[in-house]
């Protein structure tokens, strides 16, 4: 049975890998738990598109990481517009995907949302914040941004 993994499975592969497994293992374990989908031509094309888009966001090597770090730390006008109530309290909280979108709007590099390290307590008020962005092992960049009211 030919499957495409959607999550990492020990001794089998990582998300996006096309694997050949026994029919019972696929039907009774991988498919019901959502670890894989059946490999069809459409699904294979979709996986290749996702992998191509992910490759655009990946930091390739140490030199590229240093260039991205310099670019991130040079950004000064990163603003995350959100809807707020009176007193600057947010409806919800700021997520790492919101920060990535704001960086791209400000002209910064494309980042993976999993590389953003948000504070332990979530961001629920307007103001200035700083987060760490993990580029490669051992290298992080400091990113400062402002959470502002979208209506103003």
UniProtKB/Swiss-Prot annotation:
SUPFAM superfamilies: L9 N-domain-like, Ribosomal protein L9 C-domain. GO terms for molecular function: rRNA binding; structural constituent of ribosome. The keyword rRNA-binding applies. Pfam families: Ribosomal_L9_C (PF03948), Ribosomal_L9_N (PF01281). The keyword Nucleus does not apply. One of its GO terms (biological process) is translation. InterPro entries: Ribosomal_bL9 (IPR000244), Ribosomal_bL9/RNase_H1_N (IPR009027), Ribosomal_bL9_bac/chp (IPR020594), Ribosomal_bL9_C (IPR020069), Ribosomal_bL9_C_sf (IPR036791), Ribosomal_bL9_N (IPR020070), Ribosomal_bL9_N_sf (IPR036935). One of its GO terms (cellular component) is ribosome. Keywords: Ribonucleoprotein, Ribosomal protein, RNA-binding, rRNA-binding. HAMAP family: Ribosomal_bL9. Belongs to the bacterial ribosomal protein bL9 family. Binds to the 23S rRNA. This is Large ribosomal subunit protein bL9. It comes from Corynebacterium urealyticum (strain ATCC 43042 / DSM 7109).
């Amino acid at each position: 049975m030919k499957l495409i993994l959607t999550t990492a499975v020990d001794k089998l592969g990582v998300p996006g890998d096309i694997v050949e497994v026994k029919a019972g293992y696929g039907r009774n374990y991988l498919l019901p738990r959502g670890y894989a989908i059946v490999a069809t031509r459409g699904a294979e094309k979709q996986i290749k598109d996702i992998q191509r888009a992910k490759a655009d966001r990946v930091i390739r090597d140490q030199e590229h990481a240093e260039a991205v770090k310099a670019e991130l730390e040079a950004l000064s006008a990163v603003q995350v517009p959100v809807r707020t109530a009176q007193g600057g309290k947010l409806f919800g909280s700021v997520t790492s995907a919101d920060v990535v979108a704001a960086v791209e709007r400000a002209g910064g590099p494309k980042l993976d949302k999993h590389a953003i390290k948000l504070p332990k307590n979530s961001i629920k008020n307007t103001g200035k914040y700083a987060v760490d962005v993990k580029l490669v092992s051992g290298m992080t960049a400091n990113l400062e941004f402002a959470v502002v009211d979208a209506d103003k």
